[in-house]
Amino acid sequence: MEETYEIMATGNVPDMANLMLFLVIFAGGSLAWSSQLLERLNTTQAEASAAFTAYSRLALSIVEDDAHPVAASTIALASISILSHLVTNSDGFGLKVHMLRMRCLLMMRELKINSLDTPASSEERRLKGCNMIEIEVQRRIWWSMVASDWLIGFSGGHHEGAYIYQPRHMQVNYPANTDDEFITPTATDIDLPSSVPTAMSGFLFRVRTAKLCREIVDAMPSVLLDDNKADYHVVLAMDAKFQTLFKELPWFLQLDPENVEKSKEIVTQRPWIAFGRISGHFSLHSRLCRLHRPYHLEGMTNPKYAYSHEVCIRSAQTVLELRRQMDEAGAKIDIRPSRFWTVMQHVFVAALVLATDVSFSPDAPDAEARKAKVLMAYQILESSKQESSTLVESIQRNLQILMSALQKQRVQPPRESTASSAVSSGAIHDAFRDEALGSGLMEVDWDQLWTEFLAVAPDLDAQQWNSLLDDVDLGGFHPALF
């Protein structure tokens, strides 16, 4: 850093990869502000937000400068991958994110990272030597990008059911399960068993979750190409993989009270373990809920699918509870979950899933308790407005678009035929189209939105609910909107 500043002070141009790395680090620091940090620096939230925008745009301008392209290097690659993560969690899945991810893929291929651990590459390193720090960083970048790609493949949205990174086109070992200080330029044999907690435990948990998402995408019919639901035996087979993953997690990443209590000392020493555990299970339960959702309403009346209804609702409730726990765990490592688009997307969808349950069983003994959980999600989203108003306003707009579609359908009686699904789909697609064309939506506060939503929801039948939930995935989080 000192060298870069000295070069700039003399009027010379610094290495652009180094400069870009510093800019994304500064941007990340600006995004992770806390009230204590703002007070210590004698600055404001608005100034921190402005700094994030400035630093991230400067870094992006370096990436986009075709006249002076940044040469492929590990530092440049790390910078672009970090920038893609920051932009994703500040702006959603817009075109900039996909451009950055594609630049990462092309640069990794140029550096031959996709074949980093083939026998030929390993032998070349043995004969010529290498810097193992750089090799480990390359493995981390590769698997971070691969995991993001596979997770997006089973997260709803227009990218559902597809992924870019093909396993048979890569041979890259997982990063070592070790702490950074044990990685030296000549280090070998530094990989520890997964039962040993390290700074990489949460990262490797994410990779395992991503691998499961890829297996689901391979096994299930694509929602974009096939109108049919997956055969139920396929859903149950994928569910079994989730249960296996839950059981095989290291004890300190288990979510049961006994292991959480047992891991308190480790969490005190390594506070990121707690956040990794919470965020990992948050991701898993979001997708377990997604897996069973096509059958969860039918499971309310058909015993064959009762398990799907139970799992879907339980996982949605778990998502909301884990989101509540994230704040305390994140504060200890300066992470603010309320500023992450992906986190709030899962909270919003979990709330809608629980709303369907309330809608179909308004007189159930625990109906009020379940309605309270839906309202808790509203409170989570509302509380996020202080720190990320644009994020919450986008979710609020999506809910209002849903309301627009629901209001149109309210005059239509529920029907058993597939036509009801078509009406639902058409209504919501029209609502999203109108919004995209700039027809505008009335400014409505959260309390009114949620009250109206829960009032209208009981008028929908199962097919209409399923269609609405699918359209939230396919339309509500479209890059143009989110």
Residue ranges and their predicted role:
Residues 1-75, 80-93, 127-133, 191-197, ...:
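C-terminal transcriptional activation/regulatory domains of eukaryotic transcription factors
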Residues 2, 10, 34-39, 109, ...:
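Fungal transcription factor middle regulatory core
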Residues 62-65, 107, 148, 245-248, ...:
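Residue position in alpha-helical solenoids
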Residues 73-81, 203-210, 261, 273-293, ...:
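Amphipathic alpha-helical protein-interaction segments enriched in hydrophobic
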Residues 91-107:
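Classical protein tyrosine phosphatase
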Residues 116-136, 326-343, 363-364, 384-396:
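Acidic, Ser/Thr-rich low-complexity linear motifs
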Residues 230, 339, 387, 419-482:
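Intrinsically disordered, low-complexity transcriptional activation domains
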Residues 361, 376-429:
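Eukaryote-biased recognition of C-terminal alpha-helical segments
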